[in-house]
């Protein structure tokens, strides 16, 4: 019977065949231990010399790392294994023998591993991170579908930019200029006026020459836009969404979190409501903590965000940033028009901002004024202004960076490990 490593638990004390790759092995004169993987998991195969043909044991000792195999044997309980079972191997069929696999069991430098990213993905740690990424995506669709959101796919090639000031990747669109999308927000706002609540999931591109552990040039973003929604209601949706994702990973990725040696007690504390601190209060807090390099009207850097998040040891919303450091489309704060109704969600443990969101300007005259103040081409934003001409309503939106969120949940140091093939400042291969 052919099965997978993950499904093998359903076949205790039965003979099965599994297609797998050999990740590592060790052997003595009488027994060989094969570390097997098949994409669904990792399992040990035990080959006992006295219980198999001589040719099988010889093959078990000689087979090379990352060779592909069909392995047949009996699934037996093993309490020492994370899975709780292993295979007593009876026969081995080599599908394809690997020679001189470059990523050997010894330690390798990061640049070497990134050069061989197509192979590094096979390792236990990288496999675990990708499984957690997959669960975050699955839980995302589950949350938005249950909450009545409609999935909308905004274009990747655009003629204008929602942020206005961010660096963009430029390309030619026949005889016109075009840019790779840095956000689907403006299109989602239009879709929200048709469907009420919408979300998107797709790649975004930022031509930022940053080398920090938090930044990728190409990253995936989950964005939501909600009509007839105010800022406070939007924050509630955001914290419910993040909490749902964290709980889903804790429930469905126990083995992966254990593989990564993640301290899950920190994730288990994540629950609504998240703490909130205004930008003004955050400035005062940082001053009291000895940060003399930040003044009112300046954006926070990584050390500032980390200090604030560490104070709460939970995801925390920083609200109501100064108008002058935020994009043109954010609604003024009625209590202080030098600030806007926005929030950044800062992840704990130094992972930084994972969500940015705001209430959107819904008044046509004010939005036209903002477009001019930011030096934007009004014609390029005419469709966006139309949304305020024809039945404008209060509405909000937010965007969550997938890779940063996965980095935080999985506990990996750098976001490059959370994308299958990360695009970094000096890396476009493989």
UniProtKB/Swiss-Prot annotation:
CDD domains: AsnRS_cyto_like_N (cd04323), AsxRS_core (cd00776). Homodimer. One of its GO terms (biological process) is asparaginyl-tRNA aminoacylation. It is found in: Cytoplasm. Belongs to the class-II aminoacyl-tRNA synthetase family. Its EC number is 6.1.1.22. This is Asparagine--tRNA ligase. It catalyses: tRNA(Asn) + L-asparagine + ATP = L-asparaginyl-tRNA(Asn) + AMP + diphosphate + H(+). Its main location: cytoplasm. It comes from the Bacteria. Keywords: Aminoacyl-tRNA synthetase, ATP-binding, Cytoplasm, Ligase, Nucleotide-binding, Protein biosynthesis. One of its GO terms (cellular component) is cytoplasm. InterPro entries: Aa-tRNA-synt_II (IPR004364), aa-tRNA-synth_II (IPR006195), aa-tRNA-synth_II/BPL/LPL (IPR045864), Asn-tRNA-ligase (IPR004522), Asp/Asn-tRNA-synth_IIb (IPR002312), NA-bd_OB-fold (IPR012340), NA-bd_OB_tRNA (IPR004365). It is an enzyme of class 6 (ligase). PROSITE patterns: AA_TRNA_LIGASE_II (PS50862). GO terms for molecular function: asparagine-tRNA ligase activity; ATP binding; catalytic activity, acting on a protein; nucleic acid binding; transferase activity. Pfam families: tRNA-synt_2, tRNA_anti-codon.
């Amino acid at each position: 019977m052919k099965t997978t490593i993950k499904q093998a638990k359903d076949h205790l004390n039965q003979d099965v065949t599994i297609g797998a790759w050999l990740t590592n092995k060790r052997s003595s004169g009488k027994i060989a231990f094969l570390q097997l993987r098949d994409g669904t998991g990792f399992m040990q195969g035990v080959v006992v010399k006295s219980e198999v043909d001589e040719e099988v044991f010889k093959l078990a000792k000689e087979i090379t790392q990352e060779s592909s195999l069909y392995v047949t044997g009996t699934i037996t309980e093993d309490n020492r294994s994370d899975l709780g079972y292993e295979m007593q191997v009876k026969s081995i069929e080599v599908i394809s023998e690997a020679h001189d696999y470059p990523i050997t069991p010894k330690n390798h430098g990061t640049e070497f591993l990134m050069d061989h990213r197509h192979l590094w993905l096979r390792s236990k740690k990288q496999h675990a991170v990708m499984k957690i990424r997959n669960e975050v995506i699955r839980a995302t669709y589950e949350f938005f579908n249950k909450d009545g959101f409609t999935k909308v796919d905004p274009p990747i090639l655009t003629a204008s930019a929602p942020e206005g000031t961010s660096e963009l990747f430029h390309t030619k669109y026949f005889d016109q200029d075009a840019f790779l999308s840095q956000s689907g927000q403006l299109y989602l706002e239009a879709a929200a006026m048709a469907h009420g609540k919408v979300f998107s999931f797709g790649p975004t591109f930022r031509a930022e020459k940053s080398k920090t552990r938090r930044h990728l040039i190409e990253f995936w973003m989950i964005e939501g836009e909600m009509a007839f929604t105010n800022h406070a209601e939007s924050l509630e949706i955001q914290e419910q969404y993040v909490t749902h994702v964290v709980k889903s990973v804790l429930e469905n990725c126990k083995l992966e979190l254990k593989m990564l040696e993640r301290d899950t007690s920190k994730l288990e504390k994540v629950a609504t409501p998240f703490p909130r601190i205004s930008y003004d209060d955050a400035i005062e807090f940082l001053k009291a903590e000895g940060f003399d390099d930040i003044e009112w009207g300046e954006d926070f850097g990584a050390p500032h965000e980390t200090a604030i998040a560490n104070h709460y040891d939970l995801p925390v919303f920083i609200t109501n940033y100064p108008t002058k450091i935020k994009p043109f489309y954010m609604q003024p704060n009625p209590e202080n028009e030098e600030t806007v109704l926005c929030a950044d969600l800062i992840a704990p443990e130094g992972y930084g901002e994972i969500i940015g969101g705001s209430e959107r300007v819904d008044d046509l005259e004010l939005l036209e004024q903002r477009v001019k103040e930011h030096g934007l081409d009004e014609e390029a934003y005419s469709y966006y202004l139309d949304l305020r001409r024809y039945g404008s309503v209060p509405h909000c939106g937010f965007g969550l960076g997938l890779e940063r969120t996965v980095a935080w949940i999985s506990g990996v140091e750098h976001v490059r490990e959370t994308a299958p093939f990360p695009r970094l400042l000096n890396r476009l291969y493989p």
